[in-house]
Amino acid sequence: MPGKHVSRVRALYRRILLLHRALPPDLKALGDQYVKDEFRRHKTVGPGEAQRFLKEWETYAAVLWQQAEDSRQSSTGKACFGTSLPEEKLNDFRDEQIGQLQELMQEATKPNRQFSITESTKPQL
């Protein structure tokens, strides 16, 4: 069973990094780093928390895939990524998670992001 779990985690991790290729370069860099940190941080959690972790990241991957598809099919060529977080979900977060979320939001909405990556903004799915 542990081998199956490890391969599921790795496949999800790779899928998310592939999906991030559809993001603008600065958001891709931010997202990639966040995913790497979160997966590393959750390496040693218990089975219950691991299942919740995987479920949330699988949902994220599905939403990101749909947004990337919508972006590719859009006639305007303008990509729209992200979603609102319902208040009831926020109420389930621990204080540490709220802090992480706030830091991520601030970083993602900075006018001059710290990442200066120059590559094509065309999605590579």
Curated annotation (Swiss-Prot):
Transmembrane segments: none annotated. It is found in: Mitochondrion matrix. One of its GO terms (cellular component) is mitochondrial intermembrane space. InterPro entries: SDHAF3/Sdh7. Residues 1-30 form a transit peptide. Plays an essential role in the assembly of succinate dehydrogenase (SDH), an enzyme complex (also referred to as respiratory complex II) that is a component of both the tricarboxylic acid (TCA) cycle and the mitochondrial electron transport chain, and which couples the oxidation of succinate to fumarate with the reduction of ubiquinone (coenzyme Q) to ubiquinol. Promotes maturation of the iron-sulfur protein subunit Sdhb of the SDH catalytic dimer, protecting it from the deleterious effects of oxidants. May act together with SDHAF1. Belongs to the complex I LYR family. SDHAF3 subfamily. The keyword RNA-binding does not apply. It comes from Mus musculus (Mouse). The gene is Sdhaf3. Keywords: Chaperone, Mitochondrion, Transit peptide. Interacts with Sdhb within an Sdha-Sdhb subcomplex. The keyword Chaperone applies. It comes from the Eukaryota. GO terms for biological process: mitochondrial respiratory chain complex II assembly. Pfam families: Complex1_LYR_2. This is Succinate dehydrogenase assembly factor 3, mitochondrial.
